[in-house]
């Protein structure tokens, strides 16, 4: 019965000594990438359900640039040049601009 406790001890030791906890595992963490992009106009009903928006870059992990709209139950990958998404972003900017007058949206675009 020395085998399993020794393995567990070594695994625990590698977790404790590693500066990155995920580095102790043999398999890298998987990342979810958009593989298909929605290009059709987006409904107002769908856009009202958006909780968070994330930009997926076309880099080493993912090969498509997309906006990921996170809803309560799912996420949708949207083409970056979708006109209805652009209009929604402008509407959100105007809405936020009314509540946060000192926020510089031009600077946010440069950072994003």
UniProtKB/Swiss-Prot annotation:
Signal peptide: 1-24
Pfam families: IL8 (PF00048)
Gene Ontology molecular function, alphabetical: CCR3 chemokine receptor binding; chemokine activity; CXCR chemokine receptor binding
Disulfide bonds: 33-62, 34-77
GO cellular component, one term: extracellular space
Compartments (UniProt record): Secreted
Gene Ontology process terms (BP): antimicrobial humoral immune response mediated by antimicrobial peptide; cell-cell signaling; cellular response to lipopolysaccharide; chemotaxis; immune response; inflammatory response; neutrophil chemotaxis
Domain of life: Eukaryota
Oligomer status and interactors: Monomer, dimer, and tetramer. Heparin avidly promotes oligomerization. Interacts with TNFAIP6 (via Link domain).
Protein name (Swiss-Prot/TrEMBL): C-C motif chemokine 27
Organism: Homo sapiens (Human)
Gene name, Swiss-Prot/TrEMBL: CCL27
């Amino acid at each position: 019965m020395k085998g399993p406790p020794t393995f567990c001890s070594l695994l625990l030791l590698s977790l404790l000594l590693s500066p990155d906890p995920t580095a102790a595992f043999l398999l890298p963490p998987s990342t979810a990438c958009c593989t298909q992009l929605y290009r059709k106009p987006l409904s107002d009903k769908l856009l009202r359900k958006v909780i968070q928006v994330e930009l997926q870059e076309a880099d080493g992990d993912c090969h498509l640039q997309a906006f990921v709209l996170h809803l309560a139950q799912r996420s949708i990958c949207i083409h970056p040049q979708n006109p209805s998404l652009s209009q929604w972003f402008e509407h959100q900017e105007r809405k936020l601009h009314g509540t946060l007058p000192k926020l510089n949206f031009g600077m946010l675009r440069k950072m994003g």
